[in-house]
Amino acid sequence: MTTENEQITPADAAIVSSGTGTKGPEERDLPASLKEEMDLCLQILREVLGEFDEKLLAKFDEVREHALKASDERFSGILTDTNPDQDDLQKVVDIVDKVDVHDAQLLARAFTTYFHLANLCEENYRVSVLHSREAAVDDAQAVDPVNEMTCAYHQLINEMGPARAKELLDQLEFHPVFTAHPTEARRKAVEGKIRRISQLLEAHKLLGGSDKKENSRRLFNEIDALFRTSPIALKKPTPVEEADTILDIFDNTLFYTIPQVYRRFDDWVLGDKAGLVPPVCPAFFHPGSWIGSDRDGNPNVTAKVSRQVARKFSDHVLGALEIETRRVGKNLTMEAETTPPSAELKSLWNHQKEMSERLTDKAALISTKELHRAVMLVMADRLKATIDRDADLMYRSCEDYIADLKTVQRSLAEANAKRSAYGPLQDLIWQAETFGFHMVEMEFRQHSVVHSRALEDIREHGLHGERGELQPMTHEVLDTFRALGSIQKRNGIKAARRYIISFTKSAQNIKDVYELNRLAFSHPEDVPTIDVIPLFEQLEDLQNSVDVLEEMIKIPEVQARLKATGGKMEVMLGYSDSSKDAGPTSATLALHSAQERIAKWAESHDIDLTLFHGRGGAVGRGGGPANRAVLAQPVGSVKCRFKLTEQGEVIFARYGNPVLAIRHVESVAAATLLQSAPSVEKRNTDMTKKYADMASKLDEAAHNRFLDLLNTDGFAPWFSTVTPLTEIGLLPIGSRPAKRGLGAKSLDDLRTIPWIFSWAQARINLAAWYGLGTACEQFGDLNTLRQAYEEWPLFSTFIDNIEMSLAKTDERIAKMYLALGDREDLNKKVLDEMELTRKWVLKIVGDEWPLQHRHVLGQAIRIRSPYVDALSVTQVLALGSLRKRVDKEELTHGQKENYTYLILCTVSGVAAGLQNTG
């Protein structure tokens, strides 16, 4: 099923397997190239399974055949109570129920491997379609219809004029913040194999003869290894190891593709002048990270860890810049006679000689009469010295390095070597401007209660323990600020200046952080510069946000930062906890209202606001297409800046493939620009006012319905019984515990990710839709709801996301999970609300079944459903057997471990099939 995180266009093809056994009717609609690749992958997988165990292959084919038939029965509606013989889902249940635990583990692996291959083929096809579209674009066209960013910029020019459009372009900023939230159920070893299989599949299309035969052999080897590799990691990653996620994405995509984003925009705006004149596109991509710095509820993230991760990031980007500087420099072989160096460049060379004659003599020896090359080679050596912390040669800041690059660029331009000035050298400048010497801006986060407790401890026992020993957590809090300061000293203020307070309740929470920052240092000059960011997460906090901000700007440290930054201020909004706290409908509307009120408040105080969106990948955590989310924001809340969290499976889906990474960044940048277009601002303002009464009524009814469910006596233990919540907590997919610290005792303490993840695994997706059906039923005005869907971007995006979530639910499977709990009253509430919500969503969008008019996405979900069903059946049977036999004390420790491992295998497989976790 196509990931919830990506906007689906006709370029995004559905996936289906074919081969021996029953075929789904949708296969006839598959593009030939996609079908061919899927045929190849399934053929190889079946051969791999046969080589491993013929009985396993036979069982795989048998389950697959009945699962496909069961899916046809579900979608065609031929299954009725009077025709039970055609219930092929029950046949799947009967087959799987007779398989022993060990063989069930292998069967789960087989289907999980299939999903990895299916996802890969889908991704490859999307890339090929994008390439085909771009190849078909006429160079004479005013804009590139495939490049959303150029389309958005031209719309701004048409509506506002070239000058104002350029002003907005220069203000453009996209801040993705990569987090270690444990929502990627694939282990890294699996990701590496998937990447290699992707490369082999691409090569397979181009090769022939013996080369193709060798490529096929390697493809067999990789798919065989993928099947034989446990989908479950051997241990949880450490926070330092989690940083490798960013390093992988940096190496494989970001470092090289982000300059391509800038270059593609320049190519269409400047036309034939691109690469011959100074660039138009600013370096607007500013990545951040919580990995190694988010300590909210994660005791594994310490001050020592933060220092290690910061050093890891810095050394890695410096190494990449060194390699690129040397590569670009070696190609600047222009002689002084043809390309005379400028006086400014000669001055830089003399400065380098004063710094180290050894380096300049070495460079001059290599590059006689090639001063541009010689200067660049010394710059590369200085980057190496920066990694080694050589005080005599190192760069003090990235700004100094960029200044040297621009000196070389100006010299080349003055010598009329413009292609050299604005070619690869400009790409290098963009890389330095984007990633700096820090790679990502580390953002620290901690719970507000931790700060208040630390201050209470200090007041009781004294800063240095004069009246008794301080608590270990207090020492850690103070060490955190010292770590932040040391990172700033090494890599610059930009490397780590943001400190986020989760569960911000009052301005006092802000004061606490500034006070602790001061107390951590003996000398005032050592106190680091920080921007404290309130994070409003729960419904009540969102409603009180403006009052808190009003008090916050009275704090002297905040006033000083506002003055120093020209009025810049950042506020974070939490989509996850607000959804678990209030339900999806109320959370969506409360967040929109809070953004609107905060934007108006900021404007009244002349504050340059950035709203930071703490969105997850799943719809229940604010997920969905990022570009549509931007366009639905209230007026004044974006201002050409968009910042959001990116995590887990979202990082891999959006940035794992270079072509798709470019598309994603361009798409978000386009929406961020368009949000300032007068036509978009007017539409959002007018529609928000027009449908305010409707929104208020939906909010109240949905909220009451959601709370009625959560407040039902015994809900929390029932929830953990009818979902694999406990088992998900055992998955080694992140260093962070599934529950918050501070004494987690209830559903309130449960993190939102396992809340979402568990409902998705049970094929219910309750967190994405519960309460909306009742709200629509009580509102009753279908015409108004339909009109709002057509006119109001916020509502249409919300309804479309819910329709997609409903399409991934399966009432037949859901009933099997709900049967694990002995609560008919709760079962009825969930199933009744699911049916009611589906009925109203279909009425609103005008569909007879979910995603009827979103053919590509609907087909993708429908085609993948049978294989997810097979894994879901395996999972729910294992859960039922495990819990029943544990209660009766019938299992040995080893048997219990085998059942648990089977469940974890199915969790990984279902996540791969659904392509979302939390």
Locate the predicted segments by residue.
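Conserved alpha/beta core surface patches that mediate binding of polyanionic ligands
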Residues: 269-287, 479, 510-515, 547-559, ...
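Active-site cores of enzymes that catalyze phosphoryl transfer or operate on phosphate-rich substrates
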Residues: 367, 373-375, 385, 417, ...
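C-terminal accessory/interaction regions of large nucleic acid-associated machines
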Residues: 720-918
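Ligand-binding clefts of soluble mixed alpha/beta catalytic domains
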Residues: 571, 603, 645-781
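Often metal-dependent polyanion-binding catalytic scaffolds in large enzymes
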Residues: 2-462, 473, 530, 623, ...
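Catalytic or ion-translocation cores adjacent to nucleophile or general acid/base/metal-coordination motifs
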Residues: 15, 301-332, 520-700
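Active-site-proximal structural scaffolding
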Residues: 38, 56, 104, 243, ...
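Short glycine-rich or small-residue beta-strand-to-loop segments that form or flank ligand, phosphate
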Residues: 112, 408-411, 498-502, 532-535, ...
